[in-house]
Every structure is written in C-alpha cells, then in structure tokens.
C-alpha cells in the first residue's frame, strides 16, 4: 500500500483511486474548471481523487505542437489548484533538474514511459522520497518492469505505483494485455497497479504530426481493465476534446465524467467484494 497523503492510500485490494485531470495545462482557468468537476463528481461518488496535468509535454511528435506553460508557471497553477480544492497532485518530470522543485509542490511524481529506463532520472526521482508513478513503456513486457522497480529500490525509494498505458502492436497501434496486470503484480511484489485508459486509446496516422485516438471506446476499455482488480484509474477529460491542445482524440468529454465514473466505481466495488481466489 502506498500512502499518497494523510487520507488517500493506493492498493490493489482497496477501492480504486482516480488519477484524473487534463492532459496538459492549457490555462489556469481550464485547470480550475476541470478540477472543480472532478472534485464534484468524486466527492459525490466517494472516489479518492488525485488531480493530474502536465506542465511540459516534452515528447510531442512535432516541434510545432503545444507543450505547455513550462515548469515555473505550471507549479504556480498547481499551487492554485491545491489552495482552491485541497487535492493532491500528480505530474510528470522529464529532466533531472525538475525533480526537486516539482517535488516541493506535487504529491506524486511521474516517470514518463519513454524515459522509464533512464537511470539518472530514476535515481533523481527516487531521491525526492515522494511516491513515483512509473509508466510502463509501450515497448516493455510487464515482467520487465521489475528491473525498473529494482533501480528505484536500490536508489532508496520503494514508494512506487506502476501504470500500464498500452503495448505496441505492430506499427502505429496499442493494445492492452489484460493478463499483464497480473504479471506485474506477481513480479513486482504486488505494488499498486493503475491503468491509463486514455493513452491506451491512442493510435497514429503514419503521416500525421499528432497522435489519434479512440475515445468512443473508453468505456469498454476502462471496464475491461478495472475488472481485473486494480489500485487506480488514470484518466484525462476535457470540456471540448476536439479543441484540446494535446491528445483530444483520446480524452473523455468532461460532461460524461459522472456517468462514466459511476459505472467504474460500481464495477470496482463488485470485483473487490469477491473473496480472493488463487489457482495454482
């Protein structure tokens, strides 16, 4: 079990935690608007909640794509969100120099999938002492996540969450291996596993300069993943996904957040009400 703050704990056997928000900080107003709706819905449904957003999308496909406001402005917005709503925050870091200042503001640091094997960044994240969400690289098998976990533990941090965001299936497509969740649980000492349903819906136009997506399938994919029995769901929503500056094709429309989460909570409650059944 990983303690995110004084009231939220993350465990595969506990009620799921929602790591939800927007893809990238487009503006302070959008961050506050989105967080307000997440807080309203999660409080109504009784779902533990962590706000997520990126201050810099450092791995965009095109050099001309919007990346975000940068670290300094991003941290200011995060502080405003915390002051207004009192929620914990998760965000990703891409550079070693970002780890210390970001750790002063946010509650959970995130290691991006494309950078998950970068040892110096792993060590810098570990040294903050904060919980770290490790995104499973699309090119890595579930069992190989144990090597990244070992790096963190050797660097002195065992406050780890593992996140599946899909696996490469041929060119320009992602799939989610439902058996992989169990493999990660067994090979990584039952660390909390969360499912990034938004990014698992990405696909690509080979000639395109940005990722496409399949948001019309978010409900069935989220149900399938959470039916395994996971510690959390990682989700991005937007008031107008078609106008989002990043990953709009995969984002849940914000006005569908309540009915969507009501279904996910009902499923999570049902799955975790079953007695544990081990088959050798």
Swiss-Prot record:
Give the enzyme class. transferase
What's this protein's name?
2-dehydro-3-deoxyphosphooctonate aldolase 2
Q: Which key words tag this protein in UniProt?
A: Cytoplasm, Lipopolysaccharide biosynthesis, Transferase
Superkingdom assignment: Bacteria
EC number(s) reported in the record: 2.5.1.55
Origin species? Pseudomonas putida (strain ATCC 47054 / DSM 6125 / CFBP 8728 / NCIMB 11950 / KT2440)
A single Pfam family, by name?
DAHP_synth_1
Q: Which SUPFAM superfamilies match?
A: Aldolase (SSF51569)
Write out the pathway annotation from the protein's UniProt entry.
Carbohydrate biosynthesis; 3-deoxy-D-manno-octulosonate biosynthesis; 3-deoxy-D-manno-octulosonate from D-ribulose 5-phosphate: step 2/3; Bacterial outer membrane biogenesis; lipopolysaccharide biosynthesis
């Amino acid at each position: 079990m990983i303690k995110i703050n004084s009231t939220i704990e993350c465990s595969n056997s506990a009620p799921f935690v929602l790591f939800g928000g927007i893809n990238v900080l487009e503006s302070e107003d959008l961050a506050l608007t989105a967080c307000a709706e997440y807080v309203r819905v999660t409080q109504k449904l009784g779902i533990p909640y962590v706000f997520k957003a990126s201050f810099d999308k450092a791995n965009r496909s095109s050099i001309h794509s919007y990346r975000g406001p940068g670290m300094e402005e991003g941290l200011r917005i995060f502080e405003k969100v915390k002051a207004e709503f009192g929620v914990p925050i998760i965000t990703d870091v891409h550079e070693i120099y970002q780890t210390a200042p970001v750790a002063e503001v946010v509650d959970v640091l995130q290691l991006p999938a494309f950078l998950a094997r970068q040892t110096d960044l792993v060590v810098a994240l570990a040294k903050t002492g904060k919980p770290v969400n490790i995104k499973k690289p699309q090119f890595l098998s579930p069992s190989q996540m144990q090597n990244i976990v070992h790096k963190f533990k050797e660097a002195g941090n065992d406050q780890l969450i593992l996140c599946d965001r899909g696996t490469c299936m041929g060119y320009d497509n992602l799939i989610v291996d439902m058996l992989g969740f169990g493999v990660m649980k067994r090979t990584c000492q039952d660390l909390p596993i969360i499912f990034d349903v938004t990014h698992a819906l990405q696909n690509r136009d080979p000639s395109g300069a940005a990722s496409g997506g399949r948001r019309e399938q978010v409900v069935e994919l989220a149900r399938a993943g959470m039916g395994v029995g996971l510690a959390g769901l990682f989700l991005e929503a937007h008031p107008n996904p078609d106008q989002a500056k990043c990953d709009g094709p995969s984002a849940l429309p914000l006005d569908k957040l309540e009915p969507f989460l009501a279904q996910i909570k009902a499923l999570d409650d049902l799955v975790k009400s079953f007695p544990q059944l081990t088959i050798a």
